From Swiss-Prot:
Protein name: Small ribosomal subunit biogenesis GTPase RsgA
InterPro entries for this protein: G_CP_dom, NA-bd_OB-fold, P-loop_NTPase, Ribosome_biogen_GTPase_RsgA, RsgA_GTPase_dom, RsgA_N
Transcription among keywords: no
Disulfide bonds: none
Its biological purpose: One of several proteins that assist in the late maturation steps of the functional core of the 30S ribosomal subunit. Helps release RbfA from mature subunits. May play a role in the assembly of ribosomal proteins into the subunit. Circularly permuted GTPase that catalyzes slow GTP hydrolysis, GTPase activity is stimulated by the 30S ribosomal subunit.
EC number: 3.6.1.-
Domain called CP-type G: residue spans: 61-218
Residues the entry annotates as binding GTP: 110-113, 161-169
UniProt family annotation: Belongs to the TRAFAC class YlqF/YawG GTPase family. RsgA subfamily.
Length: 287
């Protein structure tokens, strides 16, 4: 029987299967192989005498450390439009981490009622131009909620963003609605509102939402200097057009990315952020 781990605590794992939620323990072999089951893992289980055992952990597409979740495919990057104003460097850090982890990012701009249509259009154009979808929401009033739910289908989605952006309001809105719709499931696994630090998955519209915010650590200096450029999707059309193979678009001559910046084809603020991050990596790691 196959399923997905939606919660793990105290050595017990709760697996959602076609036959319902089954409480399981892991085989001892995983400890010997230094492989620990994670929330989000797709697993094969066996039920013996009414007790479930995890027999196999399927290959993971991704692993996040904070929160500890496997196979995340999508991130809602939540920022307030105002109060506080958008910090573009911070937004770029979140987007860089999403790209590094091969997670599809959707930028969700909260408190949309605090800005004009012109301001919204400018922000949308700016973010669309670097390759990301933008959704305008009002977490307190539930505006934009349906558009978010549409994007949850067939994904494991994590919310991320700075403090005060509205992540908790948005998350609790999802949790409250799912409590009303799936009360029996909630009772089965003992879900409460942030009563534990252990992550779990909320089943929403044929997808899952991680109940704890993602990317609580925003350090990007662990990224290899030669890999950073691949975290900027707007560079993709130019990475192979530079004179030198392996060009990092830094101090190398005849660089197609730098030419695209000069021609206005790549946003200069994004390129400046890339250079700042690259220099952080070089200075931190001395390479």
């Amino acid at each position: 029987m196959e399923g997905i781990i939606i919660k793990g605590i105290g050595g017990f794992y709760y697996i959602k299967t076609d036959e319902g939620i089954i409480e399981c323990k892991a085989r001892g072999k995983f400890r010997y192989n230094s492989l620990k089951p994670m929330v989000g893992d797709r697993v094969t289980i066996k039920v013996e005498n009414g007790k479930g055992v995890i027999e196999d952990i399927h290959e993971r597409s991704s692993e996040l450390i904070r929160p500890t979740v496997a196979n995340v495919t999508q991130a809602f990057v939540v920022f307030a439009i105002k109060n506080p104003d958008i910090n573009l460097d911070l937004l770029n850090r979140f987007l860089t981490l999403c790209e590094y982890n091969d997670i599809h990012a959707v930028v969700c701009l909260n408190k949309e009622d605090l800005c004009t249509e012109e301001e919204k259009e400018n922000l949308k154009e700016l973010i669309n131009d670097i390759g990301y979808e933008v959704l305008f929401i009002n977490a307190k009033e539930g505006k934009g909620f349906d558009a978010l739910k549409e994007r949850l289908e067939h994904n494991i989605t994590v919310l991320c963003g700075p403090s005060g952006a509205g992540k908790s309001t948005l998350l609790n809105s999802f949790i409250d609605r799912e409590h009303m719709e799936t009360g029996s499931v909630s009772e089965k696994i003992g879900r409460g509102k942030h009563t534990t630090r252990h992550s779990e998955l909320i089943d929403v519209d044929n997808g899952y939402l991680v109940d704890t915010p993602g990317f609580t650590t925003l350090d990007v200096t662990f990224i290899d200097r030669d890999s950073l450029k691949y975290c900027f999707p707007e560079f993709n059309d130019y990475n192979n057009l530079c004179k030198f193979n392996g060009c990092n678009h830094y101090k190398e001559p005849k660089c197609a990315v730098k030419e695209a910046v000069e021609e206005g084809k790549i946003n200069k603020l994004r390129y400046d952020f890339y250079i700042k991050t690259l220099e952080e990596i070089i200075n931190r790691r001395g390479n």
